[in-house]
């Protein structure tokens, strides 16, 4: 017969959850499955200084994708809410995604801020917005689409100067 021995984890020694139950189980011959963090915020290794400007930004109705670096396989993808913190990301999406991670450095995360739109629909929406205000600067033209604190990061990642007028911009 199989035996499940529930002795708590080892995440909070102050409460008695110090991992001693694993040693007890191993001593009597049980196979131990190494524990790993689950339902925890995700610490992001990111050298991009702009990332820290997002601290405190809460996003709703976004899709978080957890992608295995080696294979490019999407391990987790869900629509919901998340929060940028001083160390990475938190909130319901991040907490759930963390339970899918074996070795944290083996993954990358993407966030789709407009999951209800296909890439083609997003292109069309942006071009339509740009045509409506052709003399607006690129950075300002994104205000209808993104939270204010996210705009400088998106502008920097796009390679398009924030002050460039949107009238000559195309899908390319």
Model regions and ranges:
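Short hydrophobic core segments
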Residues: 1-17, 25-26, 82-87
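An anion/pyrophosphate-binding glycine-rich loop and adjacent beta-alpha core
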Residues: 30-36, 40-169
């Amino acid at each position: 017969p199989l035996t499940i021995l529930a002795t708590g984890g080892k995440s909070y020694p102050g409460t008695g959850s110090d991992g001693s139950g694993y040693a007890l189980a191993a001593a009597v011959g049980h196979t131990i499955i190494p524990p790993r963090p689950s339902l925890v915020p995700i610490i992001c290794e990111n050298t991009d200084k702009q990332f820290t400007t997002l601290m405190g930004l809460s996003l709703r109705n976004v899709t978080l994708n957890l992608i295995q670096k080696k294979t490019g396989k999407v391990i987790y993808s869900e629509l919901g809410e998340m929060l940028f913190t001083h160390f990475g990301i938190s909130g319901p999406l991040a907490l759930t995604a963390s339970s899918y991670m074996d070795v944290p450095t083996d993954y990358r995360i993407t966030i789709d801020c407009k999951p209800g739109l296909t890439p083609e629909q997003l292109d069309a929406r942006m071009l339509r917005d740009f045509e409506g205000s052709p003399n607006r600067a690129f950075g300002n033209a994104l205000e209808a689409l993104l939270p204010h604190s996210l705009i400088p990061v998106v502008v920097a990642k796009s390679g398009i100067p924030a002050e460039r007028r949107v009238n000559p911009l195309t899908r390319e």
